[in-house]
Amino acid sequence: MDGILIFLLSYSPGQYLVRAMQRNHLPLALALIQPDETVGDDFEELELTVNQGIHGSQDNANALLRAGIPCIYFAGSRLNGELKEFVADFGAAAKTVRQLQSMKIGIIGKLPGMGDVVTDDMAVYRRIGPEFVYDSIGTVTKFCDTVKPEEVAERVAYERTVFDVDPKMPPERHAEAVRMYIGIKRYLEANDYAGYTIHFDEFGADGRYTQLPLLAASSLMADGYGYAAEGDATTAMLMAAMVQLCGEANFSEMYMMDLKREAILLCHAGEGNYATARKDRKPFLMDRVFNEGGLSNPPTPIFAPEPGPACVMSLVHTEGETFKLVYSRGEIVDKCDLRKCDMPYMFFRPETGVRPCVKAWLEQGGTHHETVVLGEYENRIRMLCRLIGIEFVSV
């Protein structure tokens, strides 16, 4: 069981709900609906009393609030589809709360000096649920060494149906990227991780790798794993949570304000969830010159996501067990013709405008790594924040 949903059709004393809910550890929601959705001109006291659910709902909501028990509320029609949507959103949020309690995120390395990725692991564990587990690059290497050539060949053949592969790509370079993908996936599966973060310098310093795992990160995001770069376990956790809650998510960062387009260019070193790519063209798998880590060219998927409604968010740890979700709703702009951007990228147009959004992002301490969700899921994201005690801040 993931949660409890109360349908309060008539009056119920709120005081008597408190004891049971103090013993309850499941997410809670209360939906106020009525047998009749309009007041009849000839209603007598019986009809009015039968439809008096608002009376009991107020009593119960007040009692829950004063007891410090979080609850999600609905008031509306049971006939026009809005109740069905509420139940779906609450069910997804409640299930995500449960999954967060057992979630694990793998961590290998961290970029020194990057302050906004630093958090208190135990505060995350107590307030939100996931466990951050620290591993070594040797652990990943062990799993990569188990990958067989025939497994690599099968995956390479599959990827040639997914991507337009750069004709300059040496076959052995693509094969090595695939070997790393399969190995890292086995590392995640063996440890039951919902997501991971790796600092790329670990691969250059190790001496056993010839390229950075950009394709691996992109493919694992497409498989449904949470991800963030540079040891940012918080964003990897947030992405994993959004995958559970919304079905799909992406990792990126704000690269540049585009004041002319009233948009923000988002991209990262070369990772992106190509399952979100626009449907009218294949992603391009590029034999890309990239000097970070001091290694050879990493095969890099280049694409832009499907245009339409979207949101960009960041989980901020302020102090103690206090967290807030900095959230911007807007749209992915239909722009995918940057000629020399050798990374997955997107133009995000905030609903509030680029200047107010970015200014408020700074004021709220929003981090430089973000999770991106395509579609309209704000209701269930707000529910999740309320259920786990995180402030939702719209910018």
List where the protein language model places each region.
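Cap/lid and interdomain-hinge subdomains that line or gate substrate/regulatory clefts
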Residues: 32, 36-169
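Beta-alpha junction/loop-to-helix N-cap segments that form part of ligand/metal-binding clefts
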Residues: 1-25
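Flexible loop/turn segments at secondary-structure boundaries
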Residues: 12-15, 37-38, 80-82, 112-116, ...
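Short, acidic/small-residue loops that bind anionic groups at enzyme active sites
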Residues: 18-45, 50-56, 218-231
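Extended hydrophobic packing segments that form well-structured cores
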Residues: 294-395
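C-terminal catalytic subdomain
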Residues: 221-339
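Long, internal scaffold/assembly segments composed of regular secondary structure
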Residues: 156-245
